[in-house]
């Protein structure tokens, strides 16, 4: 695990360390990019929540393994100047954020230096480290999933508590965009009046450019009274309402189909399609990818893991020809619809499982001189073998998982590429998530 903020003078000691106990006083000596703090107890490494370097804390053990342990600081005996008072009253019980107790500039510096240190280890040539791509740290999420459960005979709606299955009830969330946050107390009131509360699964909310969309997952059939109450609420709040009783059946009850706009393009999406949840950072990320691709009218560009066309369509506004490839068939259908409404005729979308060989696919027989990769957390390892056969001169890799990026970057370097430049994207402030964009060239 990447570690930063190690204090040279800090003693890596712990009091009462003859054995690991459920409650123990320890001295913290370093901080990793996910906001977990590191201490040594009996020679074993412990990762501790809610602690900072140079602090002395009283910990409670969460779990202990042979090689490491996890704990949480329940009481701060000696505080660090890096600590701040969390602005959310539900922190740290709520599992939505993990780093609100750390000053924002320290969060970002920790992530950036840990990422740079790990990536630079892969090659001897210096990497051009670009400034962090960042934005506001509050009200940045345009999408969320809310858990629902009966607790103490009452229906609770919110996020799951860290390290438990309990749900923390929320009437406000400063991470969600305001139009979604204002719905929280109204939803609590609405579903408290339901007759069939045990039929409820979870709620998904999306703040699209044209509407607020809500999907309600339920088990079994909803009675007429509950459905009528839900429909009236959706109409009163001007929501696009969807019901889902299983993965293969989504019912659209009212409201417009959601879309968002980027670079003058309108991208429609289905309620469960993947979209980037931080709209301002998505715009900055797309623009940075366009800049690093250095697109000309002669370029033929391949976009792997293209989704509904978030990168592909803006690229097609400048390139000679673009091919977008995605594994999820429904998202490919949506990408084709977005292509038709955009009026762009220099782009084609294909459905292909990128975890399997694609050398026999028609699109893979075409020449491409540049490639954009935007894989899920699993990374793009398998498709790299086949991608190398296309010999692109430039690859832009968007990553949401540093571990799989390091693995994939190592393979690209073995195939003759080098990392020319890279930047951290602070897509999810106050959390341990780390996104990045990197450029590989021959």
From Swiss-Prot:
<feature type="domain" description="TRAM">
    <location>
        <begin position="10"/>
        <end position="75"/>
    </location>
</feature>
<feature type="binding site">
    <location>
        <position position="97"/>
    </location>
    <ligand>
        <name>[4Fe-4S] cluster</name>
    </ligand>
</feature>
<feature type="binding site">
    <location>
        <position position="310"/>
    </location>
    <ligand>
        <name>S-adenosyl-L-methionine</name>
    </ligand>
</feature>
<dbReference type="Pfam" id="PF05958">
    <property type="entry name" value="tRNA_U5-meth_tr"/>
</dbReference>
<keyword id="KW-0004">4Fe-4S</keyword>
<dbReference type="InterPro" id="IPR010280">
    <property type="entry name" value="U5_MeTrfase_fam"/>
</dbReference>
<feature type="binding site">
    <location>
        <position position="326"/>
    </location>
    <ligand>
        <name>S-adenosyl-L-methionine</name>
    </ligand>
</feature>
<feature type="binding site">
    <location>
        <position position="88"/>
    </location>
    <ligand>
        <name>[4Fe-4S] cluster</name>
    </ligand>
</feature>
<dbReference type="InterPro" id="IPR001566">
    <property type="entry name" value="23S_rRNA_MeTrfase_RlmD"/>
</dbReference>
<dbReference type="GO" id="GO:0003723">
    <property type="term" value="F:RNA binding"/>
</dbReference>
<dbReference type="InterPro" id="IPR030390">
    <property type="entry name" value="MeTrfase_TrmA_AS"/>
</dbReference>
<feature type="active site" description="Nucleophile">
    <location>
        <position position="400"/>
    </location>
</feature>
<keyword id="KW-0479">Metal-binding</keyword>
<keyword id="KW-0949">S-adenosyl-L-methionine</keyword>
<dbReference type="InterPro" id="IPR002792">
    <property type="entry name" value="TRAM_dom"/>
</dbReference>
<keyword id="KW-0489">Methyltransferase</keyword>
<dbReference type="Pfam" id="PF01938">
    <property type="entry name" value="TRAM"/>
</dbReference>
<keyword id="KW-0411">Iron-sulfur</keyword>
<dbReference type="InterPro" id="IPR029063">
    <property type="entry name" value="SAM-dependent_MTases_sf"/>
</dbReference>
<keyword id="KW-0698">rRNA processing</keyword>
<dbReference type="GO" id="GO:0070041">
    <property type="term" value="F:rRNA (uridine-C5-)-methyltransferase activity"/>
</dbReference>
<dbReference type="InterPro" id="IPR012340">
    <property type="entry name" value="NA-bd_OB-fold"/>
</dbReference>
<protein>
    <recommendedName>
        <fullName>23S rRNA (uracil(1939)-C(5))-methyltransferase RlmD</fullName>
        <ecNumber>2.1.1.190</ecNumber>
    </recommendedName>
</protein>
<feature type="binding site">
    <location>
        <position position="94"/>
    </location>
    <ligand>
        <name>[4Fe-4S] cluster</name>
    </ligand>
</feature>
<dbReference type="GO" id="GO:0005506">
    <property type="term" value="F:iron ion binding"/>
</dbReference>
<feature type="binding site">
    <location>
        <position position="173"/>
    </location>
    <ligand>
        <name>[4Fe-4S] cluster</name>
    </ligand>
</feature>
<feature type="binding site">
    <location>
        <position position="305"/>
    </location>
    <ligand>
        <name>S-adenosyl-L-methionine</name>
    </ligand>
</feature>
<feature type="binding site">
    <location>
        <position position="276"/>
    </location>
    <ligand>
        <name>S-adenosyl-L-methionine</name>
    </ligand>
</feature>
<comment type="similarity">
    <text>Belongs to the class I-like SAM-binding methyltransferase superfamily. RNA M5U methyltransferase family. RlmD subfamily.</text>
</comment>
<dbReference type="InterPro" id="IPR030391">
    <property type="entry name" value="MeTrfase_TrmA_CS"/>
</dbReference>
<comment type="function">
    <text>Catalyzes the formation of 5-methyl-uridine at position 1939 (m5U1939) in 23S rRNA.</text>
</comment>
<dbReference type="GO" id="GO:0051539">
    <property type="term" value="F:4 iron, 4 sulfur cluster binding"/>
</dbReference>
<dbReference type="GO" id="GO:0070475">
    <property type="term" value="P:rRNA base methylation"/>
</dbReference>
<keyword id="KW-0808">Transferase</keyword>
<feature type="binding site">
    <location>
        <position position="353"/>
    </location>
    <ligand>
        <name>S-adenosyl-L-methionine</name>
    </ligand>
</feature>
<feature type="binding site">
    <location>
        <position position="374"/>
    </location>
    <ligand>
        <name>S-adenosyl-L-methionine</name>
    </ligand>
</feature>
<keyword id="KW-0408">Iron</keyword>
């Amino acid at each position: 695990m990447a570690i930063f903020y190690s204090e040279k003078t800090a003693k890596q000691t712990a009091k009462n360390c003859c054995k690991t106990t459920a409650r123990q006083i320890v001295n913290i000596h370093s901080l990793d990019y996910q906001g977990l703090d590191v201490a040594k107890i009996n020679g074993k490494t412990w990762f501790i929540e809610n602690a900072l370097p140079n602090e002395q804390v009283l910990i409670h053990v969460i779990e202990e393994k042979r090689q490491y342990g996890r704990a949480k600081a329940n009481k701060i005996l000696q505080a660090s100047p890096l600590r701040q008072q969390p602005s959310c009253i539900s922190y740290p019980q709520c599992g939505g954020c993990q780093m609100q107790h750390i000053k924002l500039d320290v969060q970002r510096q920790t992530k950036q230096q840990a990422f740079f240190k790990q990536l630079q280890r892969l090659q001897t040539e210096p990497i051009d480290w670009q400034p962090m791509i960042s934005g506001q740290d509050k009200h940045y999420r345009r999408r969320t999933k809310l858990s629902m459960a009966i607790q103490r005979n009452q229906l609770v709606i919110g996020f799951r508590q860290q390290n438990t299955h309990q749900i923390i009830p929320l009437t406000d969330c400063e991470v969600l965009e305001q139009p979604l946050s204002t719905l929280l107390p109204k939803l609590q009131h609405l579903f408290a009046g339901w007759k069939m509360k045990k039929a409820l699964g979870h709620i998904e909310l999306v703040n699209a450019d044209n509407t607020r969309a809500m999907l309600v997952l339920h088990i079994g059939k909803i009675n007429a009274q509950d459905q009528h109450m839900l429909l009236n609420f959706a109409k009163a709040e001007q929501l696009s309402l969807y019901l889902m009783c299983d993965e293969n059946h989504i019912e659209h009850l009212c409201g417009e189909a959601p879309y968002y706009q980027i670079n003058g393009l309108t991208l429609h999406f289905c309620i469960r399609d993947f979209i980037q949840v931080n709209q301002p950072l998505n715009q900055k990320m797309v623009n940075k990818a366009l800049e690093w691709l250095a697109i000309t009218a002669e370029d033929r560009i391949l976009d792997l893991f293209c989704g509904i066309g978030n990168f592909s369509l803006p690229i097609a506004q400048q390139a000679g020809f673009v091919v977008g490839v995605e594994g999820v068939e429904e998202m490919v259908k949506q990408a084709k619809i977005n292509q038709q409404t955009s009026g762009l005729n220099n782009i084609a979308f294909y459905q292909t499982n990128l975890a399997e060989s694609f050398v026999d696919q028609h699109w893979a027989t075409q020449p491409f001189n540049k490639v954009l990769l935007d894989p899920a957390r699993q990374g793009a390892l398998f498709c790299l073998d086949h991608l190398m056969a296309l010999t692109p001169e430039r690859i832009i890799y968007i990553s949401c998982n540093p571990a799989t990026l390091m693995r994939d970057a190592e393979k690209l370097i073995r195939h003759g590429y080098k990392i020319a430049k890279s930047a951290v994207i602070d897509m999810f402030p106050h959390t341990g998530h780390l996104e990045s964009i990197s450029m590989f060239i021959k």
